[in-house]
A protein has these predicted regions:
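Short hydrophobic/aromatic-enriched beta-strand-loop microsegments
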Residues: 31-34, 75-83
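Acidic active-site catalytic centers that drive phospho-/nucleotidyl reactions
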Residues: 14, 58, 100-103
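Gly/Thr-rich phosphate-binding beta-strand-loop-beta motif of the actin/hexokinase/Hsp70
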Residues: 2-25, 107
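Anion (oxyanion) recognition and catalysis
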Residues: 72
């Protein structure tokens, strides 16, 4: 069935460590798949059947990347959305309840109403450099935290710890 001629289809994807919750609006289709290569492949096949206007997924700090790469490979129009914008949208429409299904529905509703600009995938080198910078910043933060902890230790203990 070609649903695209009848209405604009928007897909909301709530990403979790172990599963993806997917809601297709306005068709009221909800399903979950494991956040694995096979699960993502199955989700992409199902989503493509409905010819969506956009697929919106919240930026979750890397958990969403395999799904984004699959969307890009499948030539699906996708948006990596700022979680704060989705949270503010939820507040604006008065949605307070929270679970995985409702989050996926909310993201699809956000996609339909706000129609955020599609995301373009950065080159592999840019993504790699960004990942390295992020990891460096994490390590620097941890190093600062350890230095601060070392300063408040009793002298007899801190003197036995090698400085870095």
């Amino acid at each position: 069935m070609n649903t695209n001629t009848l209405q604009n289809i928007n897909v909301g994807v709530d990403t979790g460590k172990s599963q993806l919750d997917i809601y297709i609006r306005p068709l009221d289709i909800y399903f979950t798949v494991p956040n694995t290569d096979k699960g993502i492949t199955d989700a992409i096949k199902t989503i493509k059947k409905h010819k969506p206007q956009r697929v919106v997924i919240e930026a979750t700090g890397r958990l969403e990347m395999p799904f984004i790469l699959a969307c890009d490979k499948a030539k699906l129009p996708y948006v990596v959305a700022n979680p704060l914008r989705i949270k503010r949208f939820a507040e604006a429409i008065g949605q307070r309840a929270k679970n995985d299904r409702l989050d996926a529905e909310l993201i699809a509703h956000y996609a339909e109403r706000v129609q955020p600009e599609l995301t373009k995938l950065k080159s592999e080198n840019i993504r790699l450099m960004s990942d390295l910078v992020t990891r460096r910043n994490q390590l620097l933060t941890m190093q600062t935290m350890e230095r601060n902890r070392l300063q408040i230790l009793p002298k007899n203990i801190s003197s036995t710890i090698t400085r870095f």
